[in-house]
């Protein structure tokens, strides 16, 4: 690898660090993931809390990796899983259909935009995105549009770790090591209108960013462009980025004009986290294909889904079938758990709670931005929220990368009993931000506790890095 590639990837690995207390004896481990750094050993979890082997309780303020939408150890989900385990844990879809998969598909379709009525189950977000790209390509071939193969995406963005998903990911720290092996798909700028200092209105900025799709399509050759993939509300790569309202409708117009399929990556924003079941529902979006995971299984099982319109699926099936599949697609145990998660979202009215508690949490973060002027932006919807650090609020200049503020804030908050999630919003190299995305079951008292810990953590960060504070 080139030195700069090693440096970028090394910084990404540092993002993952959550160190146990150095005084603890650490047992040898044969596991490895992103790095050799060890984590504390969790013993159990319930609600919004996780306990380690020392008995210490921490608040899961990021829902794991924005996964545990309905909280840990929900008894109704566990009971549904146990009931299914007593029947069958694996049924291969080429041999039999199974009722949990059929019912979960029916319930998902009820929550989708009109016309999105075909479901393909997978085990995770990368698989969901991979499936979406492959379905789009097979649709083009089946409808005699084989010249269409390019999938335009945004920079920065993150769509998964498999090679197809990486090809549409715009995050150098993750893509650089694999550059020779991964197709270089076209990119346009993410709609970071909050950074712009121009004479345009906010909505005109949204149109400006959306129009990049038309410009890129024409530059690439419209007949070669297959699809455009985007997160309706950004995830970790952009820190809960929300585009101006004008952006979403214009994107659909451009896709329709040039026959481009619109793929929504709802892996992080879907399953209710933003206060709507889909992030795109805030703008009545009409994508052609949707990728979901994370909150769909809510941490109880590995589960994801690709949902598409019959207009896309039928030509593929008529041309010989979808040349794609996974061993655990439609697994009855996973689908029984996913169905129970949906039922809990409805029973507990968690879409409403995500909206109300999200407003409380967001207002609290905005109040903290008045005290800590190095918070330049607070954004997101529902309980998918982020705060970005800056050196200057007027220019939105980022903090110096060498301060590593995004790493320090995670370490400080964890020491105080709160898990948060951090990255860099501007291509992974600067623009420190932290995400705060607690489970959707959170109460007002728990929101206030989180805000209190964040305030204390920001105080310590300011003192550590000599950042300004308004007393």
Please place each PLM-identified region on the residue numbering.
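Short, Lys/Arg-enriched N-terminal segments with co-localized hydrophobic residues
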Residues: 5-17
């Amino acid at each position: 690898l080139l030195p700069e590639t090693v440096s970028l990837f090394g910084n990404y690995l540092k993002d993952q660090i959550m160190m146990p207390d150095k005084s603890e004896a650490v047992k040898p481990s044969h596991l490895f993931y992103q790095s050799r750094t060890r984590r504390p050993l969790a013993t159990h979890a319930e609600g919004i809390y996780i306990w380690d082997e020392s008995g210490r309780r921490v608040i899961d303020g990021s829902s794991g990796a924005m996964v545990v939408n309905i909280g840990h150890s929900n008894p109704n989900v566990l009971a549904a899983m146990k009931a299914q385990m007593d029947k069958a844990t694996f049924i291969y879809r080429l041999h039999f259909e199974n009722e949990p998969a059929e019912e979960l598909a029916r319930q998902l379709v009820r929550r989708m935009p009109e016309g999105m009525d075909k479901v393909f189950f997978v085990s995770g977000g990368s698989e969901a995105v991979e499936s979406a790209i492959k379905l789009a390509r097979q649709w083009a071939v089946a409808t005699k549009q084989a010249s269409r193969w390019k999938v335009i995406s945004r920079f920065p963005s993150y769509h998964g770790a498999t090679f197809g998903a990486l090809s549409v990911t715009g995050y150098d720290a993750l893509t650089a090591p694999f550059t020779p092996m991964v197709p270089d798909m076209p990119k346009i700028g993410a709609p970071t209108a909050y950074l712009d200092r121009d004479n345009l209105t906010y909505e005109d900025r949204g149109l400006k960013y959306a129009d990049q799709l038309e410009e890129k399509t024409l530059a690439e050759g419209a007949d070669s462009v297959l699809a455009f993939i985007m997160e309706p509300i950004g995830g970790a790569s952009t820190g809960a980025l929300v585009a101006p309202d004008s952006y979403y409708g214009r994107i659909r117009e451009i896709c329709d004009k040039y026959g481009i399929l619109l793929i929504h990556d709802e892996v992080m924003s879907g399953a209710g986290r933003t206060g709507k079941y889909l992030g795109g529902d805030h703008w009545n979006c009409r994508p052609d294909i949707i990728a979901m995971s994370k909150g769909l299984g809510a941490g109880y099982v590995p589960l994801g889904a690709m949902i598409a319109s019959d207009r896309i699926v039928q030509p593929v099936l008529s041309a010989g079938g979808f040349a794609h599949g996974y061993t655990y697609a439609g697994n009855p145990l996973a689908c029984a758990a996913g169905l129970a998660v949906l039922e809990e979202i409805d029973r507990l009215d968690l879409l409403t709670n995500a909206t109300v508690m999200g407003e409380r949490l967001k207002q609290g973060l905005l109040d903290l931005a008045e005290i800590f002027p190095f918070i330049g932006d607070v954004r997101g919807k529902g309980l998918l929220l982020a705060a970005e650090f800056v050196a200057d609020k007027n220019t939105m200049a980022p903090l110096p990368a060498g301060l590593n503020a995004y790493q320090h804030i995670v370490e400080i908050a964890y020491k105080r009993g709160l898990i948060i999630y951090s990255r860099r919003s501007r291509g992974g190299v600067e623009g420190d931000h932290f995400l705060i995305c607690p489970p959707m079951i959170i109460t007002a008292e728990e929101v206030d506790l989180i805000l209190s810990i964040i305030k204390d953590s920001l105080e310590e960060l300011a003192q550590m890095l000599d950042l300004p504070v308004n007393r």
